[in-house]
Structures are given as structure tokens and as C-alpha cells.
Amino acid sequence: MDRRALLTGISLSLALPRFARAGDFNTFLAALQARAAAQGIPQSIITQTTGNLVPNADVLKLDHHQPEFTETWAVYSSHVLNQARIQEGMQKAGASQNLLTAITSRFGVGAGPLLGIWGIETNYGTTQGDFDVIDALTTLAWDRNSDYFSGQVISAMRIIVNGDAPAQKLIGSYAGAMGQPQFMPSVYLSTAISFSGNNQPDIWTSDADSLASMANYLAKAGWHAGQPSSEAVLVPASLDISATGRENMRTIGYWVGQGVQRLPGALNLPSDMPAALLLPDGAGGQAFLIYANFRVIRHYNPSDYYALAVGALGRMVLSA
């Protein structure tokens, strides 16, 4: 049975208590379809992808009921940097060594951040989501009255028009992020590449295209080749933490002068290299020096925890 056909009647009304207004969705959908046509999307694609849509109750439930609690870095990192993910990353690093070397040579982005993003975003491509992306994005665009999500719907249609992927391949998260890198459709259009050179980037089933597309994204966002994004350090109990935080850039030499200790095996970096000291759980918790590439990773996902985890996972899987 068509899953979308189940999202009618009382089940839909229970799922949509804030906005189940008669006629709203059809009116919205007609306007979105007209906008797509005005931007050159063929009517056949518009009808194929949106002709029978109704609001997706699963998308709305997930979007409206995101957890509101705040995890500490210690708790978050214990979940994300689990042993299974680290071990799988080590295996992927070994199996993909030649590919990663070629990608680094082309884009200047090392294996560490690529493996870190790959592992955290989709557990190395194994958990990409199972939502029809156009279905999910259309639902979000309607619910939020969002020009952004409407634009993403049209970008997804354009992927089909360009011949990059058929409609049935556009599968991803409830928020519309697709494939192994979890790219939004507009990011796919601007950034995804085919490393094999066939001009049809496959970020769903091709590890090469997925990793190269991630590297291209980071390179375009300003990645500094040969530099880390962050590193764990030790800090003295007497440190004045008022000067810490992502926005308080000093230099490595400044922090070393304040008693911050870099760990054995740390990269040999110039003492005048800009760095900030981040204490995600405050005094007494873990401490990290963060660098310009930390901001680049935050461009991928604007979370300090995420950027720290990407750096940490990349270091762990390459440490074997």
C-alpha cells in the first residue's frame, strides 16, 4: 500500500495539531509547482515528483519533537566516538587508502576530516536515511512557510532534470539531507563531483564520489592544507578561562605561555599560528586548541561538538 495514502483522515489530523487547515497544503503545493515551472523545471518532472504529495506525518513528528535537552561534551562524545565507529573507521581508512591519497592530492584535504565527517554523518554510508527527499522537503516548506525548503525542492527537481540521479534515488534524512555526505540538494548541485569523471556524482552508493564531494566542500569553504582542525591539550588548574572560547583567537605560543600543554605526537605547528582554547564542558573538562580549519568544519555543521568530534574521530581512525 502507498505509504502516503495512509497519511489521511484522523491519523493525519492527530499528527498535525498546529496547522491542519483545510486546503492549505494544496494551495501551497500549487504555488510551489508554479514556482518550479517558472524556473524551468519541466511539467513532467513536477507532476512525477509532487503530483500526489500529502504532508508527511513522520517528517512533521520528527521535526516538531526534536530533543530539547542539552548534552555535555563528555556525554555526546561517548555516544559519537564509540568503539564500533572507530573500528569501522580504521577498516575504511585501510581499504580506502589509495582513494584518500588521490583525493588529498587533488583537494588538499587530508584523510582525517573526511573519515570523521563520513563516520559521524552516516556511519560510513550505512545510515543515510530512508525518506523521499522531495516529499520531506515539500512537507517542511509547507509547515514552516519556508522559502529555503521550497528552494531545496526545486534544486532536487533540477538534479533529476540534469540527469544526475532519478527521482527514486533521492533518498535521505527527514530534513532533506542526501547520501553519504548528507548534502542538501542545492549543495549537491554546487559541490558534488564525480571522482570517476562521468559527470553524474553518485553520493549514495559511490564512496569515491562521496569522499571527493566532501573534500570539495571543505576546500571551497577555505580548508588550510596540512593543518589540523583541533587537538586535545592539557590546561593548568590556574588558567584564567575568561580568555577561552571559539572567538578568542590568540596563538599557539600564547597558550603555551599560559601553561597549556600539547600532547606527545602533536603536529609540529608554528608558535605564531592562530589558535583558540575551547573548554566545551567548562573548567575541569576536556580542553582543545582549535584552529582555522575548525571553522571550516563548522561550515559543514555549525556545532562545536560536531567539529570537535570530526577532528577526534579522524585522529582516532588514523592512529592505528
For each feature predicted by the language model, list its residue ranges.
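Surface-exposed patches in mature extracellular/periplasmic domains of secreted proteins
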Residues: 44-50, 110-116, 168-171, 201, ...
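Flexible, glycine-rich surface segments
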Residues: 174-175, 179, 184-267
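N-terminal export signals
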Residues: 5-22
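C-terminal soluble interaction/assembly domains
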Residues: 239, 243-320
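Tryptophan-centric aromatic hotspots in well-structured domains and transmembrane helices
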Residues: 24-28, 115-119, 172-174, 229, ...
